[in-house]
């Protein structure tokens, strides 16, 4: 395949056109008064969104050189979204400003490599300034504020996420699903839940709701099948003497062992529920170990030389309550040692850091949540499918932003933190083209606040100058159109989002500034049309088959 090669100014100018086309489409969504973008879909209804990364992902340009520029800026927003979950529009605006200002200087004769050094030094100074302004999240109200801002000032979503985080803790799992109704609701499963139900419906304690609820039970955790009654009879007798119910978690309970449990449960001799162990293979062993640590019991494993018939009550786990339905088992308030549970949580966190597989990370995260607090599900409801998709995307954004805020704290929002970082950049002692590189970042840092106010129908430059003169956290609230303390007004951004947006924008911006040659595939004008030659009659010569 022949290639098109462009050099110097021509190459950079085409890349810049692509950058501007994408950035101009994305930046209209910024701020509380940002506008929607409607995206046509080949199948189904069009998507209406105010999410920068969703807009960016849809953009493909016809000109291959322009498209290269657009794809590089798309990388800024997707990387920021992956790392921090929000701030994609801000990152795109910063990248556009860095690239536009930078290319003006390169055209005027500045050395691109020196500009890059200056940009890197300025970004380091700005990031330090952002981190200094960060305030740790103290309460539920702060979480609600962060989530509301990220969900485009939707307080309902903000409060739901704050409730969910409050209930399951920062290590808990919060998932987002589509609701069957138009209401958006929150369901919280406290304790450890896994997707295995009772082996026999005869084990239920409430025939109406078909649920088995056992209060203060013993929990037997065994990693093999139980089929022989003689293995089990000894422990059943001890549990019956103690006057407590029993939960059996094992690979399988079958044959005479199952029959004996069912008969004794129906006769009310003992209240016992058997469930299959969750997971498969090595993951099953890990999950059984988690349950054992949570309940203060032991996994009865023949690999460790333990036999089921020799099990004592001290080897069994305990919990305040266990509920089992047809599909799920929930262990509430396991009576394990806090120190051991914390040790296990630390171990899983380390595995999450070390793993390279996304699937493994997800499964480890689930295990962590089950040990640490629980699982919350936000059911997103809306009147139409189009609204549902848009709302669900906002909830997912808000959730990611909230996690980022818990991690690195919050900073004043509305573009104020980036604007105030100009002070740190301005105080750098640099010379020549490095100083010019720092000035490029200095100029870019005021672009987000300029765009937020511009989308609100005001003159951005005027607001920028006023904001520079203000002290502390006082900034312009584009939603209420007043000057106020941004933190007190609840206009906050996660520090991680602001930091990631700037670092990713500067990274891609520097790449484009230091580009000297572009190589693209040359369109093949003489390529044969695969449908030509078939003629208007389709598959000729088939008439005889009628």
Curated annotation (Swiss-Prot):
NCBIfam families the UniProt entry points to: GroEL, PRK00013.1, PRK12849.1, PRK12850.1, PRK12851.1
Assigned EC number: 5.6.1.7
Keywords: ATP-binding, Chaperone, Cytoplasm, Isomerase, Nucleotide-binding, Stress response
Entry protein name: Chaperonin GroEL
UniProt superkingdom: Bacteria
Self-association state and partner proteins as the record states: Forms a cylinder of 14 subunits composed of two heptameric rings stacked back-to-back. Interacts with the co-chaperonin GroES.
Catalytic activity: ATP + H2O + a folded polypeptide = ADP + phosphate + an unfolded polypeptide
GO BP: any one term: protein refolding
Gene Ontology molecular functions: ATP binding; ATP-dependent protein folding chaperone; isomerase activity; unfolded protein binding
Annotated ATP binding sites: 29-32, 50, 86-90, 414, 477-479, 493
Chief localization: cytoplasm
Gene3D superfamilies: GroEL, GroEL-like equatorial domain, TCP-1-like chaperonin intermediate domain
Annotated function: Together with its co-chaperonin GroES, plays an essential role in assisting protein folding. The GroEL-GroES system forms a nano-cage that allows encapsulation of the non-native substrate proteins and provides a physical environment optimized to promote and accelerate protein folding.
Up-regulation conditions: By heat shock.
Top-level EC class as recorded in UniProt: isomerase
């Amino acid at each position: 395949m022949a290639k098109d090669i462009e050099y110097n100014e021509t190459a950079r100018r085409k890349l810049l056109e692509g950058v501007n086309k994408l950035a101009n489409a994305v930046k209209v969504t910024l701020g509380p008064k940002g506008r929607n973008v409607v995206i046509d879909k080949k199948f189904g209804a069009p998507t209406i969104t105010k999410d920068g990364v969703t807009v960016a992902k849809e953009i493909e340009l016809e000109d291959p050189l322009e498209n290269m520029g657009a794809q590089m800026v798309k990388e800024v927003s997707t990387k920021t979204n992956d790392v921090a979950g929000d701030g994609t529009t801000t990152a795109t605006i910063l990248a556009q400003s860095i690239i536009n200002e930078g290319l003006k200087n390169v055209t005027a004769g500045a050395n691109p490599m020196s500009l890059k050094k200056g940009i890197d030094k300025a970004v380091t100074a700005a990031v330090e300034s952002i981190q200094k302004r960060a305030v740790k999240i103290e309460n539920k109200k702060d979480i609600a504020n962060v989530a509301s801002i990220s969900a485009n000032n939707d307080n309902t979503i903000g409060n739901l996420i704050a409730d969910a985080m409050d209930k399951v803790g920062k290590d808990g799992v919060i998932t987002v699903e589509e609701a069957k109704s138009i209401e958006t609701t929150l369901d919280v499963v406290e304790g450890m839940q896994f997707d295995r139900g009772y082996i026999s419906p005869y084990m239920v304690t409430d025939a109406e709701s078909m649920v088995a609820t056992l209060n203060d039970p013993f929990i037997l955790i065994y990693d093999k099948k139980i089929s022989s009654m003689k293995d089990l009879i000894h422990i059943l007798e001890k549990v019956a003497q103690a006057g407590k119910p029993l939960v059996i978690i094992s690979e399988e309970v079958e044959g005479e062992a199952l029959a004996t449990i069912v008969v004794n449960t129906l006769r009310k001799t003992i209240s016992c529920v058997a469930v299959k162990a969750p997971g498969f293979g090595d993951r099953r062993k890990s999950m059984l170990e988690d349950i054992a640590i949570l309940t203060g019991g032991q996994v009865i494993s023949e690999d460790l030389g333990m036999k089921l018939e020799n099990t004592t009550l001290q080897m069994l786990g305990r919990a305040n309550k266990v509920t089992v339905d047809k599909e799920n088992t929930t262990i509430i308030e396991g009576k394990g040692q806090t120190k051991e549970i914390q040790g296990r949580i630390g171990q899983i966190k380390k595995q999450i850091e070390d793993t390279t597989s996304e699937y493994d990370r997800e499964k480890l995260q689930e295990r962590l949540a089950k040990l640490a607090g629980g699982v919350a599900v936000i059911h997103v409801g809306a009147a139409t499918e189009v609204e549902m998709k848009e709302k669900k995307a906002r909830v997912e954004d808000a959730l990611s932003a909230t996690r980022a805020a818990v991690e690195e704290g919050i900073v004043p929002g509305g573009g104020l933190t980036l604007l105030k970082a100009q002070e740190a950049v301005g105080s750098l002692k640099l010379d020549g083209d490095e100083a010019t590189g720092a000035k490029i970042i200095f100029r870019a840092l005021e672009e987000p606040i300029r765009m937020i106010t511009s989308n609100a129908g005001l003159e951005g430059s005027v607001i920028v100058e006023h904001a520079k003169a203000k002290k502390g956290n006082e900034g312009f609230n584009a939603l209420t159109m007043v000057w106020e303390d941004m933190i007190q007004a609840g206009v906050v951004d996660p520090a991680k989002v602001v930091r990631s947006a700037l670092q990713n924008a500067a990274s891609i911006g520097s790449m484009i500034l230091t580009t000297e040659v572009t190589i693209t595939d040359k369109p093949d004008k003489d390529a044969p049309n695969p449908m030509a030659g078939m003629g208007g009659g389709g598959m000729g010569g088939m008439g005889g088959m009628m």
